C-alpha cells in the first residue's frame, strides 16, 4: 500500500525524522507502487444465487433457499442429476422484445466481492486447486508489497452477459479507479485476462482521453481474444465440457448458448478471412459470413439476435488510449476449425492451429493494429508454450508484470 498522508507534510518534519521515515518506508525512495485492478475473464469469478422458484426440473433440486449460495464454482453442483438443477439456475432467458436477458423465474444472481480479490483468486470458495485462478498472481503482488482489498482489488462481473447489459458494473469500476487514485496518489494499472480484456477495452473506449491520461497508468492484457475465438462455434453448436469428464457437452450446451457473451466472442471479420471455413458438415460449411444460417441450422435463432446486439460493442480500430502490454501464449494446439459427421449434436473432429489452447494467435495479435494509432506505446510479449489459464502463473508473465509495476 502506498504511504497515506499524515496531518503534516513530510517537508515540514525535522530532517532526522524525515531520514528515519525514508529508511522505514522504502516506497518513499522508490516511488509509489501503482494501485492494481484485476479484471477476470469468462467464468473467471464466483457467482452467488438465491432461490424462490415456482417449479424445479427435478425433485432433487432446491426450490427455495434462505440465503445466497455459491452458484459458480461449486463442484458439488456439477454431479449427475444435480447438474440439471444448476443449469436451470445459471442459464439466462433472452427476451426478444427487449433484446436483453433476465434471470429465470425465482432466481436471483449476484456477483460477490467487488473490490476484493477472493472471488477471482479461487472460483471455488473451498479453495480447491481445480478452482485456482488469479491466486498465484495475487500472492506475487502481496510479496511485492501490495495489500489485498486495498491497493490490489478485483473487479468481478456477471460474465454471462456482454458489456451492454452490465452498465452498473462500469460505473462502479470507474468510481473504484478514481477512489484508488485518490487513496494511493497515482494512476491505476489494469490487469485483465481473456474476455476481461474485451470488457476493459469496451470501458476504455468510452472514457474521455483526459480521464484516461489522469487515472490509467497502463493496461496489461493477458490472453486477449481481440478478434474473437474459433472454438466459440463448437461451443454453440455442440457444447464444450472443457475436458470435465462428468459433464456431457450436450448437457452444458443450453447454459453456454444462453450466455450472450458466448455469441459476442465469435470470430470477427477484421481478424479472419471471410473465406475461412470454421465448421465443416456433410451438408454445409460455415464461414463468418454464414452466422445467420449457422444459428438457424443449430436450432438457436436467438443466437443471431444476440450476435447482432453485441457485434459492434467494441470498435476494432479504436485503440484503448493508454499504454498497452499484450501478453499472449503461443505453441499450444488451439482449436481452429471443426469437422462434423453428424451436426450439431455430436462432438466434431478438431483441426488445431497456433495459440494458447483457447485464444487463436491471430486474435491475440490483433493489438498490433493499434501501433501508430495511439500516442501511447503498444508492447507485445509472446509466452511460448503458455496455456490460456496457466499464463496467469507463468514466471515470464509475473516478471513482466513486476517490471510494469515496480520498474526494472
Curated annotation (Swiss-Prot):
N-glycosylated. N-glycosylation is important for maturation of the enzyme and normal subcellular location. It is a peripheral membrane protein. GO terms for cellular component: extracellular space; lysosome; membrane; nucleoplasm. It is found in: Secreted; Lysosome; Membrane. Its main location: secreted. Disulfide bonds join 61-85. Coiled coil: none annotated. Transmembrane segments: none annotated. Keywords: Acyltransferase, Disulfide bond, Fatty acid metabolism, Glycoprotein, Hydrolase, Lipid metabolism, Lysosome, Membrane, Metal-binding, Secreted, Signal, Transferase, Zinc. Residues 1-31 form the signal peptide. It catalyses: a 1,2-diacyl-sn-glycero-3-phosphocholine + H2O = a 2-acyl-sn-glycero-3-phosphocholine + a fatty acid + H(+); 1-hexadecanoyl-2-(9Z-octadecenoyl)-sn-glycero-3-phosphocholine + H2O = 2-(9Z-octadecenoyl)-sn-glycero-3-phosphocholine + hexadecanoate + H(+); 1,2-di-(9Z-octadecenoyl)-sn-glycero-3-phosphocholine + H2O = 2-(9Z-octadecenoyl)-sn-glycero-3-phosphocholine + (9Z)-octadecenoate + H(+); 1-hexadecanoyl-2-glutaroyl-sn-glycero-3-phosphocholine + H2O = 2-glutaroyl-sn-glycero-3-phosphocholine + hexadecanoate + H(+). Zn(2+) binds at residues 194, 336, 351, 388. This is Lysosomal phospholipase A and acyltransferase. It comes from Canis lupus familiaris. The lineage of its organism: Eukaryota, Metazoa, Chordata, Craniata, Vertebrata.
Amino acid at each position: 500500500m502506498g504511504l497515506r498522508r499524515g496531518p503534516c507534510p513530510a517537508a515540514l518534519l525535522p530532517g532526522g525524522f524525515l531520514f528515519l521515515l525514508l529508511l522505514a518506508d522504502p516506497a518513499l525512495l522508490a516511488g509509489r507502487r501503482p494501485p492494481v485492478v484485476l479484471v477476470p475473464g469468462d467464468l473467471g469469478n464466483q457467482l452467488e444465487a438465491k432461490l424462490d422458484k415456482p417449479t424445479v426440473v427435478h425433485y432433487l433440486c432446491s426450490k427455495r433457499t434462505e440465503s445466497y449460495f455459491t452458484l459458480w464454482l461449486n463442484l458439488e453442483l456439477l454431479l449427475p442429476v444435480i447438474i440439471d438443477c444448476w443449469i436451470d439456475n445459471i442459464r439466462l432467458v433472452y427476451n426478444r422484445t427487449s433484446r436483453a436477458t433476465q434471470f429465470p423465474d425465482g432466481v436471483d444472481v449476484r456477483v460477490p466481492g467487488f473490490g476484493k480479490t477472493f472471488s477471482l483468486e479461487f472460483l471455488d470458495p473451498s479453495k480447491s486447486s481445480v478452482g485456482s485462478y488469479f491466486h498465484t498472481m495475487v500472492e506475487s503482488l502481496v510479496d511485492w508489497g501490495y495489500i489485498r482489498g486495498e491497493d490490489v482489488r478485483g473487479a468481478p462481473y456477471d460474465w454471462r452477459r456482454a458489456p451492454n447489459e452490465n452498465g452498473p458494473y462500469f460505473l462502479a469500476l470507474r468510481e473504484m479507479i478514481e477512489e484508488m487514485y485518490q487513496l494511493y496518489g497515482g494512476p491505476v494499472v489494469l490487469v485483465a485476462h481473456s474476455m476481461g480484456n474485451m470488457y476493459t477495452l469496451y470501458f476504455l473506449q468510452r472514457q474521455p482521453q483526459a480521464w484516461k491520461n489522469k487515472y490509467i497508468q497502463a493496461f496489461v492484457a493477458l490472453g486477449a481474444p481481440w478478434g474473437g475465438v474459433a472454438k466459440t462455434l463448437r461451443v454453440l453448436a455442440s457444447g464444450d465440457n472443457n475436458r470435465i469428464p462428468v459433464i456431457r457437452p450436450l448437457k452444458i450446451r443450453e447454459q453456454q448458448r444462453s450466455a450472450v457473451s458466448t455469441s459476442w466472442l465469435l470470430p470477427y471479420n477484421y481478424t479472419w478471412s471471410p473465406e475461412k471455413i470454421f465448421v465443416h458438415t456433410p451438408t454445409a460449411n460455415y464461414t463468418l459470413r454464414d452466422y445467420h444460417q449457422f444459428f438457424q441450422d443449430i436450432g438457436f435463432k436467438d443466437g443471431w439476435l444476440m450476435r447482432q446486439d453485441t457485434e459492434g460493442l467494441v470498435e476494432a480500430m479504436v485503440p484503448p488510449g493508454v499504454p498497452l502490454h499484450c501478453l499472449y501464449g503461443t505453441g499450444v494446439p488451439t482449436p481452429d476449425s471443426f469437422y462434423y459427421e453428424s451436426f450439431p449434436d455430436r462432438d466434431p473432429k478438431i483441426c488445431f492451429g497456433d495459440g494458447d489452447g483457447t485464444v487463436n494467435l491471430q486474435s491475440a495479435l490483433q493489438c498490433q493494429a493499434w501501433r501508430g494509432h495511439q500516442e501511447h506505446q503498444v508492447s507485445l510479449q509472446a509466452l511460448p508454450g503458455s496455456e490460456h489459464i496457466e499464463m496467469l502463473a507463468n514466471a515470464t508473465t509475473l516478471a513482466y508484470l513486476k517490471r510494469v509495476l515496480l520498474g526494472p
